[in-house]
């Protein structure tokens, strides 16, 4: 605390000469030259900001000893005055940049917790499973910082961003009990199968026409159809490009794509509020204002149709869509229509992106590693037979398939910084003696953990057997029980749709490998694993591969 006091005093004392300017330069001189006065005052306070930055490990947002509240100080890079580390994190791959920063020998405990500044936002990041568990499990980290785009896109009333409290607990209970229960996930298997069948047929057609398949458009169309069926009870003919249904599907794709871009874009004014009316290169405010009425009209129209259809029924079957489930809730759980719009929109938004991208990463590794593909195909064939069709029940008996999906999530976590950070609502003391001050944004660098040689042996190798206990591997629960690999988060804010996402990815990978032999066409460059981080971690170059049907029909 003494150090914190000294730091604070030095920052205040640094401005002394701003008040001595009249004596130094002469009051008459300054009054006669107002521009000189303004420049001198600006220089004085800029000097104070530089001195505060120089005395603040973690950068300008950590001035006045914020990182030294506990017995163990929180160290970190200073970055630049005013801006902190914003330039290092606003472009490129921030998970890799933070990983490199945390390995700085000048801060030996930075892997546990590292302080840094994103403009005026004080932040910490953990690259250590034990400290990450403390952060994700502590009740004072139950809230999320609400960025401008999330607030304007209605997410403040949805599960992901709603502040902890009675309303958020209601949403979490609805999600776990009514929307994503194991029974309801199982009941939606026919929809997952239908979407996979349509996807495989479309891939077979593209292979026949062009000699190769670009997987991402097919995966995204199937994922959107799948989540639309689960949430709204609607599916579209992905092979049709005309008609009212095709127009509606295109409208939905457009809204989801725009939402992805807005929520995934780095908005400088979230961290430098004084820039809000000066610099908005992504036009966040204008685009959000244009998108929200479209979303509200679309979702309210779906709710209205469901209300009309449900006049004679008040209960929801296990395979009912989410709209029917929400409309069937008892009075004490019933949501206002505006809140239903927010919750349903978030389901569509979050359920489309991750499923498609994880499946693409998985297939990229299958194509890159012929031995993995051969073993996976043998397991699928043994469980299903030559002319069968993999089911959820079959998938549950395929340990190597599950290991391939886990290894994909380890090598390419879809949210390398666990997507959305946490916000400290009170000072939080950690077991290592560090104290995270209230108002601090806390992150977990899951990518750094899954690529740490002290956590995972040979982390750069793609080795599914590391998750097969009978072969000496680890029995890891990826749903938040083990912070060595927690791609869906952990604690109170763990992703509510994790079971649905895992069920979809594993089933679709099984069907893709069962239906086709996958390989690179002659003359093609090797599969590139270069990344780009938008809302999720994507392949920079979409996967394109040849897909030879293994049977007369691909589906």
From Swiss-Prot:
Gene3D superfamilies: Cytochrome P450. The keyword Glycosyltransferase does not apply. It is found in: Membrane. Keywords: Developmental protein, Growth regulation, Heme, Iron, Membrane, Metal-binding, Monooxygenase, Oxidoreductase, Transmembrane, Transmembrane helix. Its cofactor is heme. PANTHER family: CYTOCHROME P450 78A7, CYTOCHROME P450 78A7-RELATED. This is Cytochrome P450 78A11.
């Amino acid at each position: 605390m003494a150090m914190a006091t000294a730091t604070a005093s030095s920052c205040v004392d640094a401005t002394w000469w701003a008040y001595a300017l009249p004596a130094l330069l002469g009051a008459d001189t300054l009054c006669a030259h107002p521009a000189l006065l303004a420049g001198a005052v600006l220089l004085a306070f800029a000097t104070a900001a530089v001195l505060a930055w120089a005395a603040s490990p973690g950068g300008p947002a950590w001035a006045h000893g914020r990182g030294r509240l506990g017995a163990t100080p929180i160290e970190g890079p200073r970055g630049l005055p005013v801006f902190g580390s914003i330039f290092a994190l606003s472009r490129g791959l921030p998970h890799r940049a933070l990983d490199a920063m945390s390995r700085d020998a000048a801060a030996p405990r930075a892997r546990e917790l590292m302080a840094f500044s994103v403009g005026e936002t004080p932040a910490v990041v953990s690259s250590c499973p034990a400290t990450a568990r403390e952060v994700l499990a502590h009740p004072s980290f139950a809230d999320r910082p609400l960025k401008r785009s999330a607030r304007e896109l209605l997410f403040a009333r949805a599960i992901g961003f709603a502040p902890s409290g009675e309303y958020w607990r209601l949403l979490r209970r609805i999600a776990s009990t009514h929307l994503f229960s194991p029974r309801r996930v199982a009941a939606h298997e026919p929809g997952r199968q239908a979407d996979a069948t349509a996807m495989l047929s479309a891939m077979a057609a593209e292979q026949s026409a062009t000699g190769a398949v670009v997987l991402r458009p097919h995966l995204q169309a199937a994922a959107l159809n799948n989540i639309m069926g689960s949430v709204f009870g609607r599916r579209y003919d992905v092979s049709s490009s005309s008609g009212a249904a095709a127009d509606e599907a295109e409208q939905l794709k457009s809204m989801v794509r725009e939402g992805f871009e807005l929520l995934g874009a780095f908005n400088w004014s979230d961290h430098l509020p004084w820039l809000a009316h000066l610099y908005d290169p992504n036009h966040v405010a204008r685009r959000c204002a244009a998108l929200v009425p479209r979303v509200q009209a679309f979702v309210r129209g779906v709710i209205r149709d469901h209300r009309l259809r449900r006049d004679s029924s008040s209960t929801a079957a296990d395979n009912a869509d989410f709209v029917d489930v929400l409309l069937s809730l008892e009075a004490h759980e019933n949501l206002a229509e505006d809140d239903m719009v927010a919750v349903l929109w978030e389901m569509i938004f979050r359920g489309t992106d991750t499923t498609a991208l994880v499946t693409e990463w998985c297939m990229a590794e299958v194509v890159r590693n012929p031995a993995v593909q051969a073993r996976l195909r043998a397991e699928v064939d043994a469980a299903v037979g030559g002319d069968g069709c993999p089911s959820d029940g079959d998938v549950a008996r395929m340990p190597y398939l599950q290991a391939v999906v886990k290894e994909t999530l380890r090598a390419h976590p879809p949210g390398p910084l666990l997507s959305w950070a946490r916000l400290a609502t009170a000072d939080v003391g950690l077991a290592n003696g560090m104290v995270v001050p209230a108002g601090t944004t806390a992150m977990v660098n899951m990518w750094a953990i899954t690529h740490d040689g002290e956590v995972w042996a040979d982390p750069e190798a793609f080795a599914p057997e590391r998750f097969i206990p009978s072969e000496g591997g680890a029995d890891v629960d990826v749903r938040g029980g083990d912070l060595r690999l927690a791609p869906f988060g952990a604690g109170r804010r763990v992703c509510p749709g994790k079971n649905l996402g895992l069920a979809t990815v594993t089933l679709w990978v099984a069907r893709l490998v069962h239906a086709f032999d996958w390989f690179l066409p002659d003359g093609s460059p090797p599969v590139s694993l270069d990344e780009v981080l938008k809302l999720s971690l994507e392949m920079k170059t979409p996967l394109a591969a040849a897909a030879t049907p293994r049977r007369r029909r691909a589906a």
